């Protein structure tokens, strides 16, 4: 199979109306859902089938870290396994790198997984009888690459995750965090465009988890990987994700930036999820500022000497600036032009969660 052809503007991943119903009567249940609008409890009662995911749709652009989160049983792990067809959907369309995943032959699907898709699980399933070097190079061995090539790539990937010097160790000689890094290096070895990560750091201690999050974010940016990252930890999703999808009972209930999710929850379920999350690092000046024309029309204040701050300045930084001046803060665009104003009243409303 030749490499999928895409432009930089095309979505790397597209899901459109994807359903998964588990059970012997899944097709019959699917027809009933479509024709009668049955819900998850009715499907279980009438057909003895379980709705895993329900009408999931989203797109992921190139280079984005798209986090999917929800409680246990919400369908997030089931959903991510549809992207490489470890699980077959009952209905819907799945496109990855411009290829219709459901139309691929067995050989094409194996090539797609081996070359273009990398997956990292919570439990790495490293081969215990192989060294770290050979574990990392295993995907290349499956592709038939010679040992010299495998070792060269393994060395490079181990350096990326700061494990150079551990090439000849065995998994049992490594800590849990180090084993996770071996798993990430293994996923990177085939240089896939897409990474599918299913709670890869959730079993680790908080300090190690944070270190691996930092390392992963840096690698993702440097290598321009497109990632679907599954987690049950909202703090992790907010820290890592460019956008977040929240799932409940197999459905996606909201998709948005971390700021959107925290400040504009779609329903009570999302609101309960984000309760207690600090907004100080998630809400930015452009979201709460008063537009410059509107401010000048109502306030006769000379802003020429006011402190300037970029539109991407977060609440925490705005608070620091406010403590150093009695004047409003003028917000600027990417070119340095004045576009808005934040006074102390506006800042307090932003901290409380309101808009100017």
Task: Give each language-model segment a name.
Residues 297-335, 340-356:
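The conserved cystathionine-beta-synthase
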Residues 189-193:
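A short, proline-enriched helix->beta-strand linker immediately N-terminal to the Walker B motif
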Residues 255-256, 264, 341:
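ABC ATPase "signature
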Residues 170-174, 178:
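Conserved ABC ATPase signature
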Residues 92-100:
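Conserved ABC transporter NBD signature motif
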Residues 32-42, 99-100, 141, 148-165:
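Conserved ABC ATPase "signature" region
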């Amino acid at each position: 199979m030749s490499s999928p052809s895409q432009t930089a503007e095309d979505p790397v991943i597209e899901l459109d109306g994807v359903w998964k119903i588990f059970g012997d009567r899944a097709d019959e249940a699917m027809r009933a859902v479509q024709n009668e609008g049955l819900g998850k409890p009715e499907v279980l009662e009438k057909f003895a089938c379980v709705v895993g995911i329900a009408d999931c749709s989203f797109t992921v652009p190139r280079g984005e870290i798209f986090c999917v989160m929800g409680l246990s049983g919400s369908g997030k792990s089931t959903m991510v396994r549809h992207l490489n067809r470890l699980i077959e959907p009952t209905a819907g369309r799945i496109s990855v790198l411009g290829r219709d995943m459901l139309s691929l032959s067995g050989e094409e699907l194996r090539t797609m997984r081996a070359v273009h898709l990398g997956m990292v699980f919570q439990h790495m399933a490293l081969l215990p009888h192989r060294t770290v070097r050979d574990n990392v190079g295993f995907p290349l061995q499956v592709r038939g690459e010679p040992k010299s090539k495998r070792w060269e790539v393994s060395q490079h990937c181990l350096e990326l995750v700061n494990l150079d010097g551990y090439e000849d160790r065995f998994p049992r000689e490594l800590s849990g965090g180090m084993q996770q890094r071996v798993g990430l290096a293994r996923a990177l070895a085939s240089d896939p465009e897409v990474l599918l990560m299913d709670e890869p750091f959730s079993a680790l201690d908080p300090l190690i988890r944070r270190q691996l999050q930092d390392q992963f974010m840096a690698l993702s940016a440097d290598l321009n990987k497109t990632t679907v990252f599954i987690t049950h930890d909202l703090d992790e999703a907010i820290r890592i994700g460019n956008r977040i999808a929240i799932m409940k009972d197999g459905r996606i209930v909201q998709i948005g930036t971390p700021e959107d999710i925290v400040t504009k929850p779609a329903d009570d379920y999302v609101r309960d999820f984000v309760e207690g999350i600090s907004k100080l690092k998630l809400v930015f000046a452009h979201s709460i500022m008063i537009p410059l024309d509107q401010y000048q029309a109502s306030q006769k204040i000379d802003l020429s000497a006011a402190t300037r701050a970029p539109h991407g300045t977060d609440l925490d930084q705005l608070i620091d600036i406010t403590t150093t001046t009695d004047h409003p803060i003028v917000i600027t665009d990417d070119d340095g032009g004045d576009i808005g104003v934040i006074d102390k009243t506006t800042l307090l409303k932003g901290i409380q969660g309101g808009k100017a």
